[in-house]
From Swiss-Prot:
Pathway: Cell wall biogenesis; peptidoglycan biosynthesis. Its EC number is 2.5.1.7. GO terms for molecular function: UDP-N-acetylglucosamine 1-carboxyvinyltransferase activity. It comes from Haemophilus influenzae (strain ATCC 51907 / DSM 11121 / KW20 / Rd). This is UDP-N-acetylglucosamine 1-carboxyvinyltransferase. The keyword Membrane does not apply. It catalyses: phosphoenolpyruvate + UDP-N-acetyl-alpha-D-glucosamine = UDP-N-acetyl-3-O-(1-carboxyvinyl)-alpha-D-glucosamine + phosphate. The gene is murA. It holds the Pfam family EPSP_synthase. Belongs to the EPSP synthase family. MurA subfamily. It is an enzyme of class 2 (transferase). Phosphoenolpyruvate binds at K22, N23. It is found in: Cytoplasm. UDP-N-acetyl-alpha-D-glucosamine binds at R93, R122, P123, V124, D125, L126, S164, V165, G166, D307, I329. The keyword Cytoplasm applies.
Length: 424
């Protein structure tokens, strides 16, 4: 099992190119199941979760290829299997997105109950109830969610009980081929939903309101091919901005969009960072200063993103002052804090709240990554700590950050990947 060895006390500065958003690329890849003609996708990151998704699509009968430029070419015209099997699905909860397009286009589909990050309850019941309201018959049997419908799904008004990005995407995909009109109320508003809707509309869907809490989908009989470029990854962008903020550095994030990160940029400025934005870049300069502590409360978009909570927890652990972090989206999402405490951080956890007391310096040690965003916070902690830090279970990072050690080295980090069996 691979690990990272990180040598600390680096000031991270330079320019970094931001990859395509994993959280947009995954639903878009599954949405390609709906198309009767070939689709070309660009700016698709090279990640473990993307590899798993492409394997699932191949299993279904989609012809998948990456050309010399890195573009992903998909032809779903001859899908002949309708099951996403356990051996592929077990590592990635996003695989539930295969179900909606299969049922919408082929009137049947089954997906093994998914895995992924172990950060609290992420039930698929909202996906299931949405498909049922569109007319699908669904049973949970032998570890699989099995769905079928005798004819086309039928549009209706669906109020999502709790704001859910995943369920919003599932219902939106399914409704594109349903008879009549579907209205999604209390829809999630994330930029990745807007990007998926843009992709579906390029294929001939009729979706309006994506990015608001009220999405309307006029069903069509078929979707055709298109070309689409995946939006930049706002969470990767925020992560590299944090890298500069905690190390007193200056980082320019290229090929990104500031308008998807308003809540994060506001908090970075509150922490004392100088942040400048252009149409396609964000520059953060700490001018060599230590950040100030900032209170964080996660919320659905356009609120503060839960996927940036771990990175800001690290910032607060090395900031001047005391801060309160409240996690409202997921249970069990403070697993990075005990590891940061082992590095000399000071914090107390009570329920969904953490109180962080800033310290001047962290110390390198061996730590264990528990989920995707927790793991990157530990790597960044290693970059600024004294001595050497070993980060174990970095397969979590490979699920969501493209070429992370190369990008960090480009900013001045001293980091290397090694196999656990190579350790002396």
């Amino acid at each position: 099992m691979d690990k990272f060895r990180v040598y600390g006390q680096s000031r991270l500065s330079g320019s970094v190119n931001i990859s395509g958003a994993k959280n947009a690329a995954l639903p878009i890849l599954f949405a390609a199941i709906l198309a009767t003609e070939p689709v070309k996708l660009t700016n698709v990151p090279e990640l473990k979760d993307i590899e798993t998704t492409l394997k699932i699509l191949r299993q279904l009968g989609v012809v998948v290829d990456r050309d010399a430029t890195g573009a992903v070419l998909l032809d779903a015209s001859n899908i002949n299997h309708f099951t996403a099997p356990y051996e592929l699905v077990k590592t990635m909860r996003a695989s539930i997105w295969a179900l909606a397009p299969l049922v919408a286009r082929f009137h049947q589909g089954q997906v093994s109950l998914p895995g992924g990050c172990s950060i609290g309850a992420r039930p698929v019941d909202l996906h299931i109830s949405g498909l049922e309201k569109l007319g699908a018959d669904i049973v949970l049997e032998e570890g699989y969610v099995k769905a079928q419908v005798s004819d086309r799904l039928v549009g209706t008004r669906i109020v999502i009980e709790k704001v859910s990005v995943g369920a919003t995407l599932s219902i939106m995909m399914a409704a594109t081929l349903a008879k009549g009109t579907t209205v999604i109320e209390n829809a999630a508003r994330e930029p990745e939903i807007v990007d998926t809707a843009d992709f579906l509309n390029k294929m001939g869907a009729k979706i309006t309101g994506a990015g608001s809490a009220h999405i309307t989908i006029e069903g069509v009989e078929r979707l055709t091919g298109c070309e689409h470029s995946v939006v930049p990854d706002r969470i990767e962008t925020g992560t590299f901005l944090i890298a500069a903020a905690i190390s007193g550095g200056c980082v320019v994030c290229q090929n990104t969009k500031a308008d998807t990160l308003d809540a994060v940029i506001d908090k970075l400025r509150e922490a004392g960072a100088q942040v400048d934005v252009t149409e396609n870049s964000i520059t953060l300069d700490m001018l060599g200063n230590r950040p100030k502590a900032v209170n964080i409360r996660t919320a659905p978009h356009p609120g503060f993103p839960t996927d940036m909570q771990a990175q800001f927890t690290l910032l607060n652990m090395v900031a001047e002052g005391t801060s309160i972090i409240t996690e409202t989206i997921f249970e069990n999402r403070f697993m990075h804090i005990p590891e940061l405490i082992r590095m000399g951080g000071k914090a107390e956890i009570e329920g969904n709240t953490a109180v962080c007391h800033g310290v001047e310096q962290l110390s390198g040690t061996e730590v264990i990554a528990t989920d995707l965003r927790a793991s990157i916070s530990l790597v960044l902690a290693g970059c600024i700590a004294t001595g050497e830090t070993i980060v174990d279970r970095i397969y979590h990072i490979d699920r969501g950050y493209e070429h992370i050690e190369d990008k960090l080295r480009g900013l001045g980090a001293k980091i290397e990947r090694f196999s656990g069996s190579d350790e002396a």
